[in-house]
Amino acid sequence: MNIVIGKIRLQYRIVFLMIIWIAMLVLSLSFLAILQLTFQNDPQGETISSESWAGYIVSRDANAYIQVNAINGSWTVPSVSTTAGDEHSSIWVGVGGQLDDTLIQAGTEQDASGGKEFYYSWYELIPAYAVRVNTIMVSPGDVMVASLRLVDPAVNRWNIQISDSTTGQYFGTTVSYNSTGSSGEWILERPTVSNNISTLADFGNVTFAGCHLSADSKTGPIKAFYFSRIAMTNSVNTQLASVSNIATNGADFTVKYVSTK
């Protein structure tokens, strides 16, 4: 009689342990699935350090490299703090520049020099110098929109548009430029001046909004693609500008000033 009872208890224990093991396996698989889905939908873990850029970049979709053919974004022009020295900040959208030397950009400049502030819009086709847009009078608080679009791939024709939504001023041009289209960026930069990386102007903070791009046959906000955050640091890894997570709409983020140099 005792032997029978012992066998029954042993069987119950085995069944109980199997149930616990199966439950733990299911929970583990569910947790891994959640982690995988979270990374796919919001892969904000990858951060690239740069001495001159702060923002976000898209250079691949899943594990395949992409070819960007259009990009746009908007921002409110920040006011920079006036100093006796020379300090600079550039805000722009661009195509290329991470994986090769081709880079086409459109944006605004916010500089402080000799106790004065300077604001203007521009576009640039690397390696040529930036072209200043004199038909738009930029002021702090103006909402700017910039876009780049490949309109004729056969002859590498790009359309560049910059508009001041606050004043209604607009600039547009079409240029020939051989870009690989290997990446798309939304960047706040301390630009190179006289072959040296400039001192970063105190811009407070700037929010990029409505950041979208088209690559191959896909169009969407930053979060529709695999992306990387770019943190601006100096040569000894001191943070100069911080970059927020991308908003829930997948298209907005904020860059904040931390330190001049």
Protein language model annotation of sequence segments:
Residues 1-38:
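Secretory targeting signatures
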Residues 34-261:
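Exposed, interaction-prone regions of secreted/extracellular proteins
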